[in-house]
Amino acid sequence: MANICANMKRCFSPPALRAYFAEFFSTFLFVFIAVGSTISARMLTPDETSDASSLMATAVAQAFGLFAAVFIAADVSGGHVNPAVTFAYAIGGHITVPSAIFYWASQMLGSTFACLVLHYISAGQAVPTTRIAVEMTGFGAGILEGVLTFMVVYTVHVAGDPRGGGFGGRKGPAATALGALVVGAVTGACVLAAGSLTGASMNPARSFGPAVVSGHYSNQAVYWAGPMVGAAVAALVHQALVFPTVPEPAPAPATNESARHGSVQTVVV
């Protein structure tokens, strides 16, 4: 009971509140760019014909959007920007379950607010949701989302491991920027590879906000189950098979439990 009370108390400490806000704002930024680029592409091709240039534009927008989102939050919250990433770090013991729940809430709120703002400033344009292509089954789409998320989350783990260079405070802003760029790049590549099949969400928050604002919740299970399973496998593969030794955490203030995993410093409270 004492441990539970202590954990809950740390969940509302000033460093924790800053971490939650960082997750809210960074997720807001990423989803605003990701969904906004999709709206722009749709306005340029209103007949909804297949357009490779539109796919390229949204992939580039998401790559640079995630790059910026991870970079600005890396030293405060770890720059998760994705409930699947948070889930992976919780499995690895780098963030407590109560903290993960608050991270998820912040990410969901950030995504929803981004879509609300887009809806109202775009003259009432419908907010596009991630959808499964007619050629895909729900099961197949879930597997694909899991594979894509595995690649992204595994990249996050490798790019963030200090034994391979690390980033997020330990190695300086240049290393943070490089790691964030790598994560953004693999995300953009995955959008190019599977954007026409499932929308290449790889991020439950990316699908949740548009669903709430649009009111269309079809196939939400695909965009939650697939990424969560893929993230869990990525965490286990990296931590148990590839790099089984957990890095020592960097010194942190006595009021915090600093859980670093490479590039990502997660303030666990």
From Swiss-Prot:
GO CC, alphabetical: membrane; vacuolar membrane
Annotated motif NPA 1, positions: 82-84
Domain notes: Aquaporins contain two tandem repeats each containing three membrane-spanning domains and a pore-forming loop with the signature motif Asn-Pro-Ala (NPA).
Tissue expression per record: Expressed in leaves and anthers, and at lower levels in roots.
Spans traversing the lipid bilayer: 19-39, 54-74, 84-104, 139-159, 177-197, 223-243
Keywords: Membrane, Repeat, Transmembrane, Transmembrane helix, Transport, Vacuole
Chain span(s) of sequence motif NPA 2: 203-205
Major subcellular site: membrane
Membrane topology, from the record: Multi-pass membrane protein
An example molecular function term from Gene Ontology annotations: water channel activity
Subcellular location: Vacuole membrane
Protein's name according to its UniProt entry: Probable aquaporin TIP5-1
Repeat recorded as keyword: yes
Organism domain of life: Eukaryota
Classification via Pfam families: MIP (PF00230)
Organism (species): Oryza sativa subsp. japonica (Rice)
Protein role: Aquaporins facilitate the transport of water and small neutral solutes across cell membranes. May be involved in transport from the vacuolar compartment to the cytoplasm.
Keyword Transcription appears in the UniProt entry: no
Similarity section: Belongs to the MIP/aquaporin (TC 1.A.8) family. TIP (TC 1.A.8.10) subfamily.
GO biological process, one term: water transport
UniProt gene name: TIP5;1
